[in-house]
């Protein structure tokens, strides 16, 4: 009887272990989760779609929470790969995070299509956002109070824009919005608004103006002549290896095979 009970116990433990192993090797092992920058939506969405098409049974997810949230998510183990539209800060690197530049993206300065202004210098943009220039007539436009639209604190797009224009902690925003899409929609609906957004996400509902005579485009970002640009970064942990599926995705998106997909999505591949 004791031998029988012992055998039953061993079988029960074995069954439990098998169930656990199956759970670990099931859907979670065949999935890739990303979290972060809303500016990277078009690029990462296209890459995820291509990866799923080439790998039957694999699930790819993207959570558009913003760069700061995506960095926190990977640091806390809540996703496989974080997405940031800015370089990591020293304190983030000190947490054991590492970054890989996936692509480069222009930050387009956008206005309503009805606005006659088509070019501003970097200095004028800084003066507008810090409240030194408040009316469009001061920069060759129609008479109208300038409405400043920007992103929320923690946004990689905001960090890049303010760093390049030298306006950190000095912008006089009317609205601070939580996504690239919201900025574009708001500027499209207000003739006096100005905003900034990922070049890869800009639609014909707004007008991307030139900066210092240089229009934002893939070619001007690539040759460096367009002044307001930043990296699209993949964030991972140094001390935690990716799952086989997540590593396969990482290798795919950073390979030469992904360059055309990234380009078609409006960014400039880093490799």
Predicted segments, located by residue:
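C-terminal motif of bacterial Sec signal peptides marking the signal peptidase cleavage site
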Residues: 19-23
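Bacterial N-terminal signal peptides that target proteins for export
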Residues: 1-11
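Alpha-helical transmembrane segments
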Residues: 14-18
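Exported/periplasmic ABC-transporter solute-binding proteins
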Residues: 25-68, 72-271
């Amino acid at each position: 009887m004791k031998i029988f009970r012992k055998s039953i116990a061993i079988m029960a433990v074995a069954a439990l272990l098998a169930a656990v192993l199956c759970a670990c090797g099931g859907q979670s092992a065949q999935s890739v989760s990303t979290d972060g920058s809303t500016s990277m939506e078009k690029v990462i969405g296209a890459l995820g779609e291509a990866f799923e098409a080439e790998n039957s049974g694999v699930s790819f997810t993207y959570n558009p929470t913003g760069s700061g949230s995506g960095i926190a998510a990977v640091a806390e183990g809540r996703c496989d790969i974080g997405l940031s539209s800015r370089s990591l800060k020293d304190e983030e690197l000190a947490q054991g995070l590492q970054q890989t530049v996936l692509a480069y993206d222009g930050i387009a300065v956008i206005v309503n299509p009805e606005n006659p202004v088509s070019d501003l210098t970097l200095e004028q943009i800084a003066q507008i956002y810090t409240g030194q220039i408040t009316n469009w007539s001061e920069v060759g436009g129609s008479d109208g109070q300038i409405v400043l639209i920007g992103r929320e604190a923690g946004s990689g797009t905001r960090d890049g824009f303010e760093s390049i224009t030298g306006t950190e902690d000095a912008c006089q925003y009317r609205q601070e919005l939580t996504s690239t899409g919201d900025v574009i929609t708001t500027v499209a609906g207000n003739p006096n608004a100005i905003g900034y957004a990922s070049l890869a996400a800009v639609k014909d509902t707004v007008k991307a103006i030139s900066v210092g005579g240089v229009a934002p485009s893939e070619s001007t970002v690539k040759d460096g002549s367009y002044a307001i640009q930043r990296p699209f970064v993949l964030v991972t942990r140094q001390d935690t290896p990716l799952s086989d599926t997540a590593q396969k995705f990482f290798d795919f998106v950073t390979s030469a095979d992904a360059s055309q997909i990234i380009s078609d999505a409006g960014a400039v591949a880093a490799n």
